[in-house]
Amino acid sequence: LALGASPIMAHAEEEVETLAAHAGCLVLNIGTLSTPWLKSMELAQIAAKKNKRPIVIDPVGAGATELRTHAAQAILEHGGITAIRGNASEIAALAGSGGTTRGVDSTLESDRITQEASTLAKQYDCIVIVSGAKDFVTNGVHTCMMEHGDAWMSRVTGMGCTATALLGAFLAVNEDAFRAAIHATLFMGLAGEWAHKSGLGLGSTKVAFIDVLGDPQEQAFPKILRYSWA
């Protein structure tokens, strides 16, 4: 909402197809996974795919349990995925390289699985975003590495899901999925840095983060961005 998007969280089978068909982007987040929701996600995914809507999956906790790993893999196999965003362990689990997840936290550093992320992007013809101390965005051919953000972001619940929602908002208005993913990831990191400078503690820093999402000021962002290509 702060960014200007208008999200709606729907799980009922009776409405997900209609909503997904008309949404700017469908975000499938398995954070609060339950078996009945899997059918709703499948219906929403089919509708979004049929209507050529971008689809994002956040495989929260993939690698922590078989249910989460298999659910995320099933969503990928259904097809039509535009982007996958997760931490290093979640992406490694989807790539089948044995990543383990501690709750929603990664046990791997993001720069250790760049090859797995690239392979996953090629396999499903999508964009893969690996979040961490360094963020990586790859389309399977080119990879952009960004070094923005702040350590406080890993200490507040929901920041990963926020990054995924932000990605969905950017994809809804930019048909170039690779560019949209890079811009969303950069903006998330830069907003986190600015919030750290403005906040006094974790609570006020999160409020400051929402402030910059709602009213990004030019002075809040550095003139030189820290990124590289591979």
Located regions from the model:
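Glycine/small-residue-rich loop that forms an oxyanion/phosphate-binding "nest" at active or ligand-binding sites
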Residues: 37-86
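Active-site cofactor/substrate anionic-group-binding motifs, chiefly glycine-
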Residues: 2-52, 57
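Short, small-residue-enriched loops and turns at beta-alpha junctions
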Residues: 33-36, 61-65, 136, 153
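Conserved phosphate/ATP/ADP-binding segment of small-molecule kinases
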Residues: 67-143
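Charged C-terminal helix
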Residues: 190-230
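Short, small-residue alpha-helix embedded
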Residues: 93, 157-187
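Short pre-catalytic strand/loop immediately N-terminal to key active-site residues, enriched for Gly-Thr
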Residues: 118, 144-157
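Short, well-structured alpha-helical segments that form the helix of a local strand-helix-strand
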Residues: 116-121, 177-192, 209-210
